[in-house]
Structure formats: C-alpha cells, structure tokens
Amino acid sequence: MGKNVVVLGTQWGDEGKGKIVDLLTEQVTHVARFQGGHNAGHTLVIDGKKTVLHLIPSGILHSGVTCFIGNGVVLAPDALMKEIHELEAQEVPVRERLKLSPACPLILPYHVALDQARELKRGEAKIGTTGRGIGPAYEDKVSRRGLRLGDLLHEERFATKLKEVMEYHNFALTQYYGAEAVDYQAVLDEALLLAKELRPMIVDVSDELHLAREAGKNILFEGAQGSLLDIDHGTYPFVTSSNTTAGGTATGSGFGPLYLDYVLGITKAYTTRVGAGPFPTELDCEVGEHLGVKGHEFGATTGRKRRTGWFDAVAVKHAVRINSMSGMCLTKLDVLDGLKEVKICVGYKNSAGEDVGIPCDAEGWEDIQPVYESLPGWSESTVGAKSVDALPQAARDYIARLEALVGITVDIISTGPDRVETIILKSPFA
C-alpha cells in the first residue's frame, strides 16, 4: 500500500516547505498542489543551484514524477507558461508530466488590476497582498461568475463569459477605484493563444489521484503559504484567500480526506512574517536583525524583507490542532547558532493580565502580549549536522521543549538549505 502525505506550513509561510517537499519527492510518483496561486514561492537548492517555483509543484525537478495542479489552485495562464518555459530552458521536461484540473479558477489581467487598485485605495490600511490577482480570482469563484481552465476548451463560450465578467469588473475599476479599464480584446486574444499550449495538460485530477492511490503509489500533497494565513483559521483579515490547512487538501484536489495518512508541519525554529498583520513575538532589536540577516529573510515571490521574532508555541500548537498534524519538520535551526539565549512564547496575556488563547480577529490580536520562557543558547554550529547526537546539547534541549509545548514530535530537522543537510528521525512514508 502506498502512503499519502500532506506537507503544510505551521506559521505565516516561508517555513522552508520547498526543500522538504523536494527531499520527500524522492519517495513518491505523484505530487499535487491544492490551493493558492503564483503568490507562493518555493525555493529549492539542489547541488548548489537555486530554483524558485511559484505554481508548478516542486516534484517537477524529479524525472518520473507526475505533478498535478488541483481545482483549489487559482491559475494564471501567463505565469504558468512563463514557469514552464523557464524550466524547459533548463532542459527539465514539463508538459508530459504536468496535469491541470479543468476546474482551476483562472487569474486574468483584470484580477491583477483589481488587486493592485484595492491595495492602493487602502493606503496605510493595506493588507499586504502580492498584487497578483489571487484574492479577486477566488472572489469570482465564490460568487460563481469566475472563468475556469475548462472554459478555455470552448472558445465561443469563453468569449461570451469573459465579456460579461469584464463589463462587471471594468465598471468597478473605473467608477469606484478611478483606475483604467482593462481591454477585453487583448485579454481574450492572449487567453486563447495560451489555451493552445495548456489544453494537452488538462485532465481529471481527482480521478488520476485516486487511480494512483488504488495502484499503491505514494502521493505527496504540497501546501503553499502557512496555516496562520488560512482564510478561516488565520489572522483575519491579514490572511490569504484560500484554505492553507489540511482540510484544503481534500477540497482542493478531490482526494478523499480519510485517504490521507500523514500530515507534516514544516516549522521554522523561530518565526517570520511578510507584510502587515498580527505578530506577537516580533523583535525590533538586534536579535531580530540577526535572525533576518543570518536567515536571509526575504520573500521568494515579492523580495520583501520578512519580519522576524521568537518561536510562538501558542500559534504553532493551534496549527497542530487544526491540521491534525502527525509530526513536525524543524527548519533553520542553524539561524539560532551563536545566540546566548533563545526564547519561546508559551502563552498570551491581554492588557488586563488575563491568560487568553488565539483571537479570532485582528483587533483581538492587538491586545496580546507574549509570555516568554528563556532557554540557554549555543555557540557551536549546527550547519550540516547529520544526526541529533551531532547537535549541541542546548539545541537538543530547545527541540525537546518545542515538542512538549506543541504536542507532536520533530520527525525531521533541516540543518541547511541543501537537501543533504537534513536529519530524518522518522520518514512520513515509513
């Protein structure tokens, strides 16, 4: 029997999922994306060579692996083809191994225009989107006016639907946001041109995944962003527009939830966040600067500097619960090397000094103060360590304390950016 494993971020994204997905892909024949869009950035370092993927699953770099983009992913045809061409320029075969769900909502130029016009109008109150049209595309999906990849199989139908939806959005762009209208004919011509290249890759993704399961294949589901950015369970409204948690795996791929065997939570040894939104353990001091510089904390998609802070065990425990996580992968432990003291947030208090849990809205987060526990740091390097025994005792104590606080074991430890710099204590596919 094969195993079906989900890889998710437990924080606000940028936890290092790309490397771990790439590592685990050596044990699978199928990899699937199930939510998000090209707002996600997966950075892989293989034999010292850096590759950044935004839409295509990381498994594409492994020959013999079939990659799927499920119905929960919002698809920008131009961004996808750009990524395909870039991989093909590196002599990576893509088209015969990449399968696309016809139910993927399309991101088209008017979605991008709306996204950027909205952020501009919000001014200092902006949410901090990537400006790539993700939110507006999901809105169209929920309002049932959105165009889907399968519509491109029928040119006349696509043209009629496109005209109708563009009249609606251009009215908002010009009359409310004071922006320029998006040209209908230009959008139509480009979409139909791209459709010719995309059509051969369109398949029933749900059916293909179940056939693979029935054949006893190992399947990996690759999450994007992080659990604290989930549209329902994250720090609303400073969240993404999709379900980044384990429940999104089933709805975003058509794969039955009871067929999932293991949920791996990728967790940074400290905390980072890109853009606006609550961040109780944020450090605006030398330690925060140390984490940012040593951790190279710049977004793979936007290049924006990430905010940094101590490990938040309260938030991660919340992520463990809502995802029913089986085990954790701890990344970037080496960034803490050299610190005399490391802190962990073990609780929240409000301004009245009362113990509180995870708030459900941004206003509730504003009244949060972290409660810290301090542990000794370590001066020795953890970079490239191949076993737990090779880690400094203080680092091992830190890991053990994190396990106790969040309620699951650390099954994998990443000790550097290359996939060989990894300690596997328990394989999700074992």
UniProtKB/Swiss-Prot annotation:
Q: Which residues bind Mg(2+)?
A: D14, G41
Q: Which UniProt keywords apply?
A: Cytoplasm, GTP-binding, Ligase, Magnesium, Metal-binding, Nucleotide-binding, Purine biosynthesis
Q: Which residues bind GTP?
A: 13-19, 41-43, 306, 332-334, 414-416
- GO CC annotation terms, alphabetical: cytoplasm
User: Could you tell me what reaction this enzyme catalyses?
Assistant: IMP + L-aspartate + GTP = N(6)-(1,2-dicarboxyethyl)-AMP + GDP + phosphate + 2 H(+)
| This protein's record includes keyword Ligase | yes
Active site residues according to the UniProt entry: D14 (proton acceptor), H42 (proton donor)
> What are its cofactors?
Mg(2+)
Query: Signal peptide: which range, if any?
Result: none
The record ties this protein, via PROSITE patterns, to: ADENYLOSUCCIN_SYN_1, ADENYLOSUCCIN_SYN_2
Q: Which residues form a coiled coil?
A: none
Q: What is its EC number?
A: 6.3.4.4
Record-level GO BP terms:
'de novo' AMP biosynthetic process; IMP metabolic process
Q: In which pathway does it act?
A: Purine metabolism; AMP biosynthesis via de novo pathway; AMP from IMP: step 1/2
HAMAP family (UniProt xref): Adenylosucc_synth
Subunit structure, interactors included: Homodimer.
The task this protein performs is described as: Plays an important role in the de novo pathway of purine nucleotide biosynthesis. Catalyzes the first committed step in the biosynthesis of AMP from IMP.
Q: What is this protein called?
A: Adenylosuccinate synthetase
Gene source species: Teredinibacter turnerae (strain ATCC 39867 / T7901)
